[in-house]
């Protein structure tokens, strides 16, 4: 079996050291470097300030980011599976960890993703529940935008709980109805 060569940072990002700019070749968006320790502190602070709302805020941030990754890419001639591979390459090169499809099919009702070396919990230990809400949101946002419909993402295992990887279940779900729709007013 032939060895597949991963893209380098230069393949995925333009680094302009004179101007102090990093630009993604995938999304054409400007980016920045953010340390895992700083992320862990910010994540913990958001959870401390907003309590049970903290994880929801983090997931929504990821959701918006995931949708934007898909929206900004010209994929008119790109199959969904190829596009997912491009996103996986971006995650690896950005230092987020290695994401793989471990079971199922994201175009169907259910799929599982596994992330080894997840940056979002790499500096967080001893937790009793998963803490990668941002990454769950990225997966959900990208899936909603790429495959259509609405999805739910559940983090089933997390390195912050001493698991070997962060594993996510992606499920297609029924669209949420408004209060008026639920009452039959619309």
Q: Which stretches of residues belong to each language-model region?
A:
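Active-site helix/loop of acyl-thioester processing domains in fatty-acid/polyketide metabolism
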Residues: 132-148
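N-terminal accessory segment detector
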Residues: 1-133, 152, 157-186
